[in-house]
């Protein structure tokens, strides 16, 4: 039997905690036998003293085991269970293409996603712009969809990593969110509860990233790869660029539209294509569906070219109670904004800098995201036809097309776009889409 205060004291004094001590504390968070004050105290000691790799693995596994861990053995699936997690960005719609693409190549993707957080869009919010789309199927239905379609994207239920919810709520109000061991455990507890064989992490770098510097993004990616592999799940990470909006659009319905256009080949933003393909390649190799980069890319290109990936997306939408002809008739189903109008720069020039975070917040301000959990979302608003770094803009080429609910909202968004995008006399050096791959 342990005492919570003795565990806190031990960590306060700079000592490593045992697996048993960590499990006792996390189970106490779940069972409400550990107080909020004790959670806050332990979080702060971890913030200042860090954790060893064995402690990080124990914390992650204890949080994972605080609830249900999905088990797929009874379905006798003929491929690996794989997933991707992104630290979040603006116009980061990769999940909607990646899931169907990997499923079409033989993987199974039980993707448990989140809502928008701060300036970053949420996959669930995007999918809910599709009429009827059900993000909370019951467990049996979820398993059926995975078996029949190969991919389902759903919301987190209270049975998955419940200790994380309480732990995070306390961290949020005690200035202990930005601790790498705690971020790592929070992300991985939920992902590892999916019962995965392999995982790829997309850790964003730049103005629209969760971590403020390249070095911190890199440290987080390395921590996640180390802990996840330590927990028995083959994991790699890519550091990808978020110094500009990733897709050509930012919002909810507008990003779903772009995802369908990507899958059908109607339009593919080159940077979005690079990041999506790179993540899919990792999933195919880690999931042993391809032996190397070249084989993985060939398989992925084939399922885009032959329409199989688009077909899987359509089947997923239908299986989750969306329209059965969504891929063919997406324009009929997705909500459209009352006012759609381009915004132009005040002077000519080349796009040299973009504050992706500010553009994400502009979408929130238009009603496309939440300031607090109870807010309702206007799925129709956002930006399309975004200028990219290096683009020349003038009276013909706009900075973006704004989809707004009224003229006032459009004016505010136009101001935000102009403030977020800097111009120069010449095009800047191009930046890579993928900075680094991290593996064990």
Curated annotation (Swiss-Prot):
It catalyses: thymidine + phosphate = 2-deoxy-alpha-D-ribose 1-phosphate + thymine. The keyword Glycosyltransferase applies. One of its GO terms (cellular component) is cytosol. Keywords: Glycosyltransferase, Transferase. Its EC number is 2.4.2.4. Pfam families: Glycos_trans_3N, Glycos_transf_3, PYNP_C. It is an enzyme of class 2 (transferase). The enzymes which catalyze the reversible phosphorolysis of pyrimidine nucleosides are involved in the degradation of these compounds and in their utilization as carbon and energy sources, or in the rescue of pyrimidine bases for nucleotide synthesis. Belongs to the thymidine/pyrimidine-nucleoside phosphorylase family. This is Thymidine phosphorylase. It comes from Shigella boydii serotype 4 (strain Sb227).
